[in-house]
């Protein structure tokens, strides 16, 4: 028993020394402690088993130390080193092992969890540097410094936590229970029992910083409190030096005292560590609660900021209203000077109140920025938890102090020892550690007191801010009441304006529908015409290709015949020369046969006469072909004259369009000015209308809605400005394009003049060619004449080459002319399209201007009436209007509200219809959002209008793109057709040339010899008379087909011109009808304005009578 008791005493002594070594810690040591705690939860099972083995070895080593060795070596410092060597090297246990041990113990014993104690192994790492200085930092203070250096994490709050179900509880609970000494019941100096605290254990994924650590880090301890703490520490040190405890105690008594002191120190360590864990560890639900509180605080701050911004915007709006109000007062009859003075005083008061609200909100912002991001409710909960913990600590502290005082009394009664042993040093270190712990507790108490004071101060500041907010609200309400009386009259004006605007919108919508229908009908007609023209052209091209193939075959045959004829003529000439030579020889030889030869010559002369007759027949055929060619040339000249007449008509039309463009420019400039004025008036009327509607409902609603309305007004103004700038840019671009087109038209006119000169030159060239052709005919006649002795073939070949070269030049010139004419036609078509668009835009702008002028006149009349009413009210003095007048005004307001609602609904329906119409036109575009909400506010109305206008612009642009693509395709197809026609014209010219050559090569062949002349003539007649008939028939067919084609094309163009004339006449009639309808609408609006003016006069008379009646009743 004695050996076991000695072993227990030695073990407790070693534990006490180890715990004392952990009291004085530096910042680096605390960080070393925290890092293995985090790393311990991630260790593998192999590492944890090694830690357990090392811990068991250290415990065995501690129990082997005897009590006698303690007595003998009490003064040597090696005892402490040997005792702490094995324990200091043991690492911390992982939380997973501790959880497994606790779960196994709970399942076996079904016992409740023991009080929360520390394991000695968790503090063995701190035994390397044992210091006795009093100024070392305590664990709590060093932990607080560690919190300040760590990163921020999510906010958490305290909540009850069941440590029995937590799987992350540390392993040092069970080990510390096993290693605690067994206390005797008879011992007088027992420590107060440690209460079972709730175990806020730290999970593996728990944060290292939290809300409480942030709050504690923000606390600043004053210098005076630190001085007091140092003074107390010095006083306690002096008392311990003077007392000299343990001089007359035995070893057993000293051991008991040491054990008691060790227990006290261990309990204080546990409490400090427990508080440290409570600061670090929270439950997940508490984290969520703190996050919600933080979000609520942020929303409150955002609402306050928005309120401040709204008040600032309201101030700026009221300041901006000063100028238009002044301009309005200048236009109206000037009121009495007393009213002006009262208005100025009210305005100055409102400005002063607004400045006070600004200052109050600025102060609120500054104070709010200094505050933390935590709500008052969460802060009070944390404060209550900390106060409860501190109360418990104070009670325990008082019990400990009483026990310490009793120990001091007992120690003072006994005789002091002559020399200080190791036990005395241990006692001194324990006493100093107790002092440090007490100082830490006092510091925490003082920090909590300071925190409470700060809470009280913050609560007071919040109350002051609420009072300031209430005062600001009251000032705003007073301002709203003052502005309500001023804006009451403008509400009627805005309502009348909205009525007129709705009427104008209906009229514009009808006009848009008519314009859309006209454009659709025109497009359908153009498409049908285009398709018919394409079909006709395709058929015509096919016929031409077939005829050209036939003519090619005929020409190939004719060319072959002409070559054969030339060869036969050459052979005949050579044979004739040879025969003449032979004949001369024979004459010389045989004079007797001369008579016979004469007979033969006569026969030859007869044959030659026959050949000349045939030649004459061929000449007649050639003349007929020339006549046909002349008829074709006359037809071509007629076509040229028609084209020139068409170009002259187009020039006249262009001049007319130029005059219309100039007038449109002037009207567009006037329209821009009027539109700008109307848009400014509409914005003002909408602002007044919305403000009045909101003020009638409730003043509190005004304060909440003014913010959003002012923002929407600014955005709407910006969007309208952008829209106007875009319109101006588009208009400028259109004007530039028109100028360019006019310049191009001037160039076209100059090109037409040059074309005319070129045509004249070509006619001259044609005359020269005709003369050359006649000369060629004469040369051919001379070659076949009897009187000519030699042939002129070379001369013929040269002339033919010249004719071919000149023909090629003429063809190139005609091609160039056709291209120029084509470009001119394209430019004319583009100009006609642009002019049509300008005419349509001109109509729309005229209608808008007429409507805006009418609305302006009505608004001016209403303003005059309202100004006269206000002037009469001011003259009547401060007397309030009668109940009848008030009831009438209320009825009028209700009726006007109903009208406004109806107008808004009509406007929304009109916008929907317009959008649907544009979507029908743009089949490929995306559908437009037609779900337009009730536009009862400026923001919603402006947003809806802007969105619809943007979508309309997009749809219009897409429609324009489609039209442009259609025009491009149409132009490409026309170019292709023009190319085909040009090729056809070239082929026709070539055919004409070949037909001309056919006349020269259609003569019959000459026989080979004079003796066989009859046979050759008969054979030639049989062979060549047969194919002559199909050649003539083919040529005649080609000429008749050409005539028919020319007549068909001229007929198509005539039909087109007639249709264009009909369209122009229909457009003129439509314009006349539009003018008549506009005049009728103007007359209707004038009648309505007159009726409204009469009603206003009657209302004025009734209002003027009602105050007189009320004054009589008062009298």
From Swiss-Prot:
Disruption phenotype: Abolishes cytoplasmic microtubule (MT) nucleation from SPB and non-SPB sites. Leads to MTs escaping from the nucleus to form fewer and thicker cytoplasmic MT bundles that curve around the cell tip. Curved cell shape. Leads to unclustering of centromeres at the nuclear periphery; normally, the centromeres cluster at the SPB during interphase. Residues 72-102, 119-130, 139-151, 1001-1011, 1086-1095, 1104-1115 have a biased composition (Polar residues). The modification Phosphoserine is found at residues 94, 1005, 1009. Keywords: Coiled coil, Cytoplasm, Cytoskeleton, Microtubule, Phosphoprotein. Residues 165-176 have a biased composition (Low complexity). Residues 28-41, 56-71, 1016-1025, 1067-1084 have a biased composition (Basic and acidic residues). Residues 25-180, 1001-1037, 1067-1115 are annotated as: Disordered. InterPro entries: Cnn_1N, Mto1-like_Mto2p-bd. Residues 523-537 are annotated as: Required for interaction with mto2. GO terms for biological process: astral microtubule nucleation; centromere clustering at the mitotic interphase nuclear envelope; dynein-driven meiotic oscillatory nuclear movement; establishment of mitotic spindle orientation; karyogamy involved in conjugation with cellular fusion; microtubule nucleation by interphase microtubule organizing center; nuclear migration by microtubule mediated pushing forces; spindle pole body-led chromosome movement during mitotic interphase. The keyword Ligase does not apply. Its main location: cytoplasm. It holds the Pfam family Cnn_1N. One of its GO terms (molecular function) is calmodulin binding. One of its GO terms (cellular component) is outer plaque of mitotic spindle pole body. Residues 445-915, 1072-1102 form a coiled coil. It is found in: Cytoplasm, Cytoskeleton, Microtubule organizing center, Spindle pole body; Cytoplasm, Cytoskeleton, Microtubule organizing center. Interacts with mto2; the interaction is direct and required for efficient binding to the gamma-tubulin complex. Interacts with gamma tubulin complex subunits alp4, alp6 and gtb1. Interacts with mcp6. This is Gamma tubulin complex adapter mto1. It comes from Schizosaccharomyces pombe (strain 972 / ATCC 24843).
């Amino acid at each position: 028993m004695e050996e076991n008791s000695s072993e227990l005493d030695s073990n407790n002594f070693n534990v006490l020394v180890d715990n004392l070594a952990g009291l004085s810690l530096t910042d680096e040591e605390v960080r070393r402690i925290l890092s293995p705690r985090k790393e311990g939860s991630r260790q593998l099972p192999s590492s944890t088993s090694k830690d357990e083995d090392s811990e068991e070895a250290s415990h065995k080593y501690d129990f082997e130390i005897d009590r006698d060795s303690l007595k003998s070596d009490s003064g040597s410092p090696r005892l402490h080193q040997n005792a702490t060597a094995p324990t200091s090297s043991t690492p911390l246990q992982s939380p997973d092992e501790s959880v497994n041990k606790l779960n196994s113990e709970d399942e076996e014993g079904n016992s409740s969890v023991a009080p929360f104690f520390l394991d000695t192994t968790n503090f063995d790492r701190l035994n390397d540097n044992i210091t006795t200085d009093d100024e070392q930092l305590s664990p709590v203070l060093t932990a607080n410094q560690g919190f300040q250096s760590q990163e921020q994490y999510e906010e958490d709050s305290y909540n009850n936590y069941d440590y029995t179900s937590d799987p992350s509880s540390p392993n040092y609970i069970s080990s510390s229970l096993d290693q605690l000494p067994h206390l005797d019941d008879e011992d007088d100096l027992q420590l107060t029992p440690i209460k079972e605290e709730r175990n806020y254990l730290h999970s593996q994924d728990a944060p290292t910083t939290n809300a409480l650590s942030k709050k504690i880090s923000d606390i600043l301890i004053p210098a005076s409190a630190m001085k007091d703490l140092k003074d107390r520490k010095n006083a306690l040190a002096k008392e311990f030096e003077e007392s000299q405890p343990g001089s007359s105690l035995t070893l057993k008594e000293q051991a008991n005292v040491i054990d008691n002191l060790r227990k006290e120190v261990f309990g204080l360590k546990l409490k400090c560590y427990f508080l440290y864990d409570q600061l670090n560890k929270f439950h997940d639900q508490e984290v969520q609660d703190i996050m919600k509180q933080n979000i609520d605080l942020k929303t409150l701050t955002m609402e306050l900021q928005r309120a401040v911004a709204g008040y600032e915007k309201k101030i700026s709006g009221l300041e901006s209203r000063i100028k238009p109000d002044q301009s309005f007062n200048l236009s109206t009859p000037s009121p009495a000077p007393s009213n002006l003075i009262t208005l100025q005083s009210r305005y100055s008061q409102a400005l002063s109140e607004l400045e006070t609200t600004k200052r109050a909100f600025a102060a609120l912002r500054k104070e709010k920025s200094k505050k933390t991001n935590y709500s008052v409710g969460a802060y009070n909960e944390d404060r209550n938890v900390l106060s409860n913990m501190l109360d418990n600590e104070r009670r325990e502290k008082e019990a400990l102090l009483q026990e310490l005082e009793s120990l001091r009394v007992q120690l003072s009664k006994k005789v002091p020892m002559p020399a200080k042993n190791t036990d005395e040093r241990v006692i001194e270190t324990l006493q100093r550690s107790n002092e440090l712990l007490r100082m830490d507790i006092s510091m925490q108490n003082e920090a909590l007191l300071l925190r409470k004071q700060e809470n009280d101060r913050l609560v007071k500041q919040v109350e002051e801010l609420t009072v300031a907010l209430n005062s600001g609200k009251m000032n705003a309400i007073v301002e709203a009441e003052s502005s309500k009386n001023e804006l009451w009259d403008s509400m009627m004006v805005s309502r009348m304006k909205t009525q007129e605007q709705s009427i104008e919108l209906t009229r514009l919508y009808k006009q848009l529908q008519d314009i859309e229908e006209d454009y659709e009908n025109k497009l359908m007609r153009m498409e049908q015409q285009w398709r018919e023209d394409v079909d006709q052209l395709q058929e015509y091209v096919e016929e031409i290709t077939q005829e050209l193939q036939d003519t090619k075959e005929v020409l190939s045959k004719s060319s072959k015949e002409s070559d054969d004829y030339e060869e036969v003529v050459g052979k005949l000439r050579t044979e004739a020369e040879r025969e003449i030579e032979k004949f001369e020889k024979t004459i010389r030889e045989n004079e007797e046969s001369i008579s016979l030869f004469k007979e033969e010559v006569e026969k030859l002369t007869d044959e030659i006469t026959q050949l000349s007759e045939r030649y004459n027949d061929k000449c007649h055929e050639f003349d007929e072909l020339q006549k046909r060619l002349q008829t074709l040339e006359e037809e071509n000249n007629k076509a040229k004259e028609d084209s020139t007449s068409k170009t002259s008509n187009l020039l006249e039309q262009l001049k007319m369009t130029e005059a219309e463009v100039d007038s449109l420019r002037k009207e567009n400039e006037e329209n821009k000015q009027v539109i700008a004025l109307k848009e400014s008036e509409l914005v003002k009327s909408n602002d007044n209308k919305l403000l009045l509607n909101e003020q009638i409902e409730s003043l509190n609603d005004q304060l909440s809605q003014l913010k959003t309305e002012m923002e929407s007004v600014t955005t709407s103004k910006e969007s309208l400005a952008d829209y106007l700038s875009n319109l101006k840019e588009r208009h400028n671009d259109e004007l530039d394009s028109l100028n360019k087109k006019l310049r191009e038209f001037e160039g076209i006119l100059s090109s037409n003049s040059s074309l005319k000169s070129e045509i004249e030159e070509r006619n001259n060239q044609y005359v020269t060619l005709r003369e050359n052709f006649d000369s060629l005919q004469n040369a051919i006649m001379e070659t076949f004449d009897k009187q000519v002795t030699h042939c002129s073939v070379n001369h013929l070949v040269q002339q033919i080459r010249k004719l071919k070269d000149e023909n090629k030049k003429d063809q190139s010139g005609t091609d160039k002319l056709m291209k120029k004419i084509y470009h001119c036609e394209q430019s004319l078509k583009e100009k006609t399209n642009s002019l049509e668009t300008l005419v349509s835009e001109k109509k729309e702008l005229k209608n808008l201007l007429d409507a805006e002028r009418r609305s302006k006149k009505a608004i001016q009349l209403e303003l005059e009436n309202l100004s006269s009413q206000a002037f009469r009210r001011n003259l009547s003095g401060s007397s309030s209007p009668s109940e009848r007048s008030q009831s009438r005004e209320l009825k009028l307001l209700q009726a006007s509200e109903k009208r406004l609602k109806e107008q808004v609904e009509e406007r929304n329906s009109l916008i929907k219809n317009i959008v649907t119409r544009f979507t029908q036109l743009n089949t490929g575009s995306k559908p437009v959002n037609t779900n337009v909400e009730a536009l009862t506010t400026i923001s919603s109305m402006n947003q809806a209008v802007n969105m619809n206008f943007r979508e309309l612009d997009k749809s219009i642009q897409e429609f324009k793109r489609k039209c442009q693509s259609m025009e491009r395709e149409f132009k490409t197809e026309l170019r292709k057709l023009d190319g085909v026609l040009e090729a056809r014209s070239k082929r026709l010219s070539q055919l004409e040339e070949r037909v001309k050559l056919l006349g020269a090569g259609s003569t019959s062949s000459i026989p080979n010899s004079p003796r066989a002349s009859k046979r050759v003539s008969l054979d030639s007649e049989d062979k060549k008379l047969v194919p002559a008939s199909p050649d003539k028939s083919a040529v005649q067919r080609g000429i008749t087909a050409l005539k028919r084609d020319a007549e068909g094309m001229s007929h198509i163009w005539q039909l087109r011109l007639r249709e264009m004339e009909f369209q122009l006449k229909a457009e003129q009639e439509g314009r006349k009808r539009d003018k008549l309808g506009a005049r009728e609408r103007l007359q209707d609006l004038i009648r309505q304005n007159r009726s409204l003016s009469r009603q206003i006069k009657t209302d004025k008379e009734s209002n003027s009578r009602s105050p007189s009646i009320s004054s009589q009743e008062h009298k």
